């Protein structure tokens, strides 16, 4: 039924202008606006929609993962742009917030609304 449908995901934010600045300027993503919705244009022709929600509650899980060739370099660049990395109990993270346990190297951070994002080495 949906084999030829170009599905997309979406998530909420309380302030679309603030989200546009963060995703466009801080993260460097291409963005556009469609009917008061923020569209994030991701690599590979994928789009994600950010919609306004006044009674917003941040996601308690990772909503977007950004695969990178060098997670340490990405963390350093994001830190220089004012991004702060999260620390989670039960995960042994280094001084930069990078988890170097099982699986790929990964570091989590939040957008201005408190939604969880991650960079992971691929």
Go through the PLM ranges and name each one:
Residues 8-10, 39, 49, 63-65, ...:
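Short aromatic/hydrophobic contact patches that present stacked aromatics
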Residues 1-2, 66, 75-122:
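Vicinal oxygen chelate
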Residues 1-18, 61-64, 120-122:
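N-terminal beta-strand motif that seeds the catalytic metal site of vicinal oxygen chelate
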Residues 34, 60, 100-103:
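Exposed loop/turn and edge beta-strand positions of beta-sandwich/beta-sheet ligand-binding modules
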Residues 45-47, 56-58, 69-73:
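Short, charged/polar surface micro-motifs in flexible loops or helix N-caps
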Residues 4, 10-48, 54:
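Core segments of cupin and vicinal oxygen chelate
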Residues 22, 72-77:
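Short amphipathic alpha-helices within nucleic acid-binding modules
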């Amino acid at each position: 039924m949906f084999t030829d449908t170009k599905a997309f995901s979406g998530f909420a934010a309380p302030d679309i202008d603030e989200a546009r600045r963060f995703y466009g300027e801080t993260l460097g993503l291409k963005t556009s606006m469609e009917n008061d919705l923020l569209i994030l244009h991701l690599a590979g022709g994928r789009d994600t929609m950010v919609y306004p929600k006044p009674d917003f509650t941040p996601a308690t899980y990772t909503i977007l993962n950004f695969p990178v060739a060098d997670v340490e370099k990405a963390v350093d660049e994001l830190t220089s742009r004012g991004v702060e990395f999260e620390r989670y109990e039960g995960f042994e993270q280094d001084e930069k917030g990078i988890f170097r346990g099982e699986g790929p190297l990964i570091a989590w951070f939040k957008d201005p609304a408190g939604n969880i994002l991650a960079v992971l080495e691929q």
